Amino acid sequence: METYDIAIIGTGSGNSILDERYASKRAAICEQGTFGGTCLNVGCIPTKMFVYAAEVAKTIRGASRYGIDAHIDRVRWDDVVSRVFGRIDPIALSGEDYRRCAPNIDVYRTHTRFGPVQADGRYLLRTDAGEEFTAEQVVIAAGSRPVIPPAILASGVDYHTSDTVMRIAELPEHIVIVGSGFIAAEFAHVFSALGVRVTLVIRGSCLLRHCDDTICERFTRIASTKWELRTHRNVVDGQQRGSGVALRLDDGCTINADLLLVATGRVSNADLLDAEQAGVDVEDGRVIVDEYQRTSARGVFALGDVSSPYLLKHVANHEARVVQHNLLCDWEDTQSMIVTDHRYVPAAVFTDPQIAAVGLTENQAVAKGLDISVKIQDYGDVAYGWAMEDTSGIVKLITERGSGRLLGAHIMGYQASSLIQPLIQAMSFGLTAAEMARGQYWIHPALPEVVENALLGLR
């Protein structure tokens, strides 16, 4: 039986752990899917490449507003797809080749799960191909998978998820998206901008319900002018109609469409690992970790979607850096270890308009009993926003009265994911709203002035 110093399950952020410090250690890397994980292959990177194409199309369609006549002759979907995966697929292949060429690394390309802990304390790992090996330390970085509602599964109807929809052979005329979160909002934007009719089936009353209420309500209102929203509805059955689908909703209505995209969230892969055999605790579907990313089993760490509630690549990367350091420390030597910092975890939704957030929502701040000040600033109130003729972009800031401490920032509009970065920095380094507003120059007439004005408007 093969024996290793370290085994890593998953090649997303977990694949970044083995650097030159591990050259003397024998390692196993286990990956059942495409090398590189969700972000590289079916998540952050390809989706943003599709979003960029959508932004180009949207800009062309809106050009007449600025005195420029332009139109789209056609969308060459094959070329859109080829541009994306012609660049991404070679990265996955070269990443696997790089690991296979390392003299101290073996790659296992099937699903891997835990077996019983060995008498010497080493962890037994088993692959679906029948291979068995042991490791002294294990990193669980097995990621997550899409959630499919039971009614859709039971119906037997054809569906896509974010894992598959970017490789469809041709653009549909009409797509139905079941879901209301980040993934649903981004793909609604992509397909709509490329000329596809979009219908969203939403269980609640609004899109992006995890966002601050102001953002959620305004975004849903904007979305309703572009996409058909079926709110307070669930799919109860479905049928295949030729190459399309017919979905029956709980109000008795039927929606006919060419393609169904299920975007109802993702779930940790912790339940697929037989983690209990290794003494690894799993709660609410996720591997439990402490601030050092240690699990309940000595020598076993976890990171990313399999253990984190955030399901964000930048969080997984941060946790991977923590694990990378702590693997080289004695298990009990927490003085030498570093801890994860999840105080201010930002997120962005690359939809239209773009959305970004960090910290508390207004409702969360109120629920904590904090005395708060809130300011909402329109993009159109500053020179660059006025030049753009922007009528929907906003910056919403929440601070604690008295201390001026920034509690939350929520932005909807052009380049929201970039505009929010200095606010993340201010929160991380303890700057007050006043210090941030008056302690630096703000370039005029640049769009970040909307952040400056929001800061100055706080009382």
Curated annotation (Swiss-Prot):
Keywords recorded for this protein, A-Z: Disulfide bond, FAD, Flavoprotein, NAD, NADP, Oxidoreductase, Redox-active center
A Gene Ontology term for the protein's cellular component: cytosol
GO terms (BP aspect): 2-oxoglutarate metabolic process; mycothiol metabolic process; pyruvate metabolic process
Domain of life: Bacteria
InterPro entries from the UniProt entry: Class-I_Pyr_Nuc-Dis_Oxidored, FAD/NAD-bd_sf, FAD/NAD-binding_dom, FAD/NAD-linked_Rdtase_dimer_sf, Mycothione_reductase, Pyr_nuc-diS_OxRdtase, Pyr_nucl-diS_OxRdtase_dimer, Pyr_OxRdtase_I_AS
Keyword Nucleotide-binding: no
Binding site for FAD: E31, Q32, G33, T34, F35, G36, G37, T38, C39
Cofactor binding mode and count: Binds 1 FAD per subunit.
Function per UniProt: Catalyzes the NAD(P)H-dependent reduction of mycothione (the oxidized disulfide form of mycothiol) to mycothiol.
Name this polypeptide is given: Mycothione reductase
Organism: Mycobacterium tuberculosis (strain ATCC 25618 / H37Rv)
Gene this chain is encoded by: mtr
